[in-house]
Design a protein with these regions (language model features):
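Long, compositionally biased intrinsically disordered terminal regions
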Residues: 3-14, 133-280
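Hydrophobic alpha-helical segments that drive targeting, anchoring, or assembly
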Residues: 5-164
Length: 280
């Protein structure tokens, strides 16, 4: 029985590699019953050979960033994948210093069919820490904060979340009385509980990676925007706009901005002109 907890991942806070991952943004994905080449193919990655250790992966990604002139908006990146044993057979571990973008949702659904995918990420800078668990093509549980879960079975992992040290009540609510815990370390422990893979610095540094250049993903179509804000006094603002409303307003604003400026001048009356000319 796997009893790993957040304590077993305390090493991440003294690891130069993990510090780099947190600062640059990363995604670590574990995929059951898929080979590294198969995973990179589904991701649409262009093969970039193999490399020993994370240093080669970082160098390859840095070289790609230079190729695109360090374009901030370019979301392509070099990912590394290798095979490692875990629960119920071989798994593929994919690591990318991708700013926390993660593998595209459609790809993960495909990769998890007939198996399991577990992923965690950080976007660096102003950190957003995400966790995802897919099973047989279905997003079962996802969260940023463990007390605000989503997915088709958002509460299924609550017992495991509590066991690895996350501060939750048996009902899955935040437990104010629970001791402080390193949430990121707890998430890595949770991933091990679901995969049987102990991620260590040496595992990542010593692996032989299949490298692939992951292209930018096309933007998803959207149908509207919702603003849902609750202020410190508990006042809530909830309002939504359909795509058509936003498009109409945008077209109107654009037309007004491009319209010619007309300056009108009112001709003074004869009496006003007389007073102006005489100075009366």
């Amino acid at each position: 029985m796997n009893l790993v907890t957040a304590h077993d991942y305390a090493w991440i806070r003294t690891s130069p590699l993990f510090r780099h991952a947190m600062e640059s943004g990363y995604t670590l994905t574990l995929i059951r019953a898929r080979t590294p080449r198969e995973v990179l193919r589904v991701m649409g990655a262009e093969p970039r050979g193999t490399g020993e250790g994370t240093a080669v992966l970082i160098e390859a990604d840095d070289a790609h960033r230079a190729e695109v002139d360090y374009d901030y908006w370019d979301e392509s990146y070099v990912a590394g994948a290798f095979s490692t044993p875990g629960e119920n057979g071989a798994w593929t571990l994919v690591l990318g210093f991708d700013g926390g973008l993660g593998i595209a949702g459609a790809c993960v659904e495909t990769l998890s069919k007939g198996g399991r995918v577990v992923a965690h990420s950080t976007n660096g800078g102003k950190p957003i820490h995400l966790f995802h668990w897919f099973e047989d093509g279905e997003l079962r549980t996802t969260f940023e904060g463990p007390s605000s879960r989503d997915g088709n079975t958002p509460d299924e992992l609550v017992p495991l979340l509590r066991e690895v040290g996350l501060p939750l009540t048996p009902e899955g609510e935040h437990d104010e009385s629970a001791p402080d815990v390193d949430v990121k370390a707890a998430v890595l422990a949770l991933a091990e509980r679901l995969t049987g893979i102990r991620v260590t610095e040496s595992l990542l540094q010593d692996a032989t990676y299949e490298l692939g250049l992951v292209p930018e993903q096309p933007a998803e179509e959207w149908t509207g925007v919702v603003i849902d804000i609750t202020d410190a006094q508990g006042e809530r603002l909830h309002r939504g706009w359909a795509y058509e409303e936003i498009a109409t307003a945008s077209d109107r604003a654009r037309a007004e901005a491009n319209a010619p400026v007309v300056i009108t001048f009112n001709e003074p009356s004869a009496m006003d002109r007389s007073e102006y000319e005489t100075g009366d």
